[in-house]
Amino acid sequence: DGALVRVQLIAEDLPEVLTVPQQALQRDLGGYFVMAVDDANRVEQRRVGVERQVDGLAVIGSGLEPGERVIVEGVNKVRPGITVDAAPAEGG
């Protein structure tokens, strides 16, 4: 027995945005960060600006460029400076 309501869909005309899975996102007293993997497969902690989080994704406003690799599984097993064997995640 739901109540009848009226809604208005507000569609934003957004440019393409950069997103990462929320599970890649970590937070400490300094703010949000991800663990990125460089071309030599070395891990580096990268501070990121998060504009919003929706549907399991974080919209990144700063700190990453399109095409950069971030760790989405095993984040708790790495630290900056180590070398990893990076494999693509499901869907990306």
Report the location of each language-model feature.
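Hydrophobic alpha-helix/coiled-coil detector that fires on Leu/Ile/Phe-packed helical surfaces
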Residues: 1-16, 25, 36-42, 54, ...
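Short, solvent-exposed beta-edge and connector elements
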Residues: 3-4, 47-49
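Nucleotide/phosphate-binding loop and acidic/charged catalytic motifs
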Residues: 21
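Short aromatic-glycine-enriched beta-strand elements
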Residues: 31-33, 58
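Conserved hydrophobic/aromatic positions in well-ordered beta-strands
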Residues: 33-35, 82
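A residue-level detector for short acidic-glycine micro-motifs
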Residues: 36, 50-52, 62
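Exposed loop and linker-edge segments at protein-protein interfaces
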Residues: 47, 57-88
